Curated annotation (Swiss-Prot):
Keywords: Activator, Chromatin regulator, mRNA transport, Nucleus, Protein transport, Transcription, Transcription regulation, Translocation, Transport, Ubl conjugation pathway. InterPro entries: TF_ENY2, TF_EnY2_sf. PANTHER family: ENHANCER OF YELLOW 2 TRANSCRIPTION FACTOR. Component of a deubiquitination module (DUB module) formed by ENY2, SGF11, and UBP22 in Arabidopsis. Interacts directly with SGF11, but not with UBP22. Interacts with MOS4. Expressed in roots, cotyledons, leaves and upper part of sepals. Disulfide bonds: none annotated. The keyword Mitochondrion does not apply. This is Transcription and mRNA export factor ENY2. One of its GO terms (biological process) is mRNA export from nucleus. Belongs to the ENY2 family. Component of a deubiquitination module (DUB module) that specifically deubiquinates monoubiquinated histone H2B (H2Bub). Does not seem to be a component of the TREX-2 complex. Seems to act independently of the SAGA multiprotein complex. The DUB module is responsible for the major H2Bub deubiquitinase activity in Arabidopsis.
Length: 115
């Protein structure tokens, strides 16, 4: 920044470029806002929760958490550690059918919302 006694600092070119990048709204953000505003995001969250329970994924994650706690000792495990250890396994084990159904619903929403 260039400073002056008589006027506020003039931003450098790099600062201006960074400002433009911060102002850009991504397509992902637009879709997320529309999903929230319409209430469809909550519907999708409920759909995913139901499908993960139906396929046994939730039970698998509960078992994985319990095994990790048992292995490390109840007093030596924090919630943050449990999340750090279990999250990659959980994400990798979401069935493709659940991912496909969610993607299909999002695509249909985008088409119907004319985004």
């Amino acid at each position: 920044m260039k400073h002056s006694v008589n006027r506020p600092p003039t931003p450098d070119e790099d600062d201006v470029a960074d400002g433009f990048e911060k102002d850009k709204v991504t397509l992902r953000e637009i879709i997320n806002v529309k999903l929230v505003e319409s209430g469809e995001k909550e519907n999708l969250m409920e759909l995913v929760r139901d499908r993960l329970v139906e396929c046994g994924w939730k039970d698998e994650m509960r078992i994985a958490c319990r095994e990790h706690v048992k292995k490390k000792g109840r007093k030596d495990v924090t919630v943050d550690e449990l999340i750090r250890v279990i999250t990659p396994k959980g994400r990798a084990s979401v069935p493709d059918s659940v991912k496909a159904e969610l993607l299909n619903r999002i695509q249909n929403f985008i088409v119907s919302a004319a985004l």
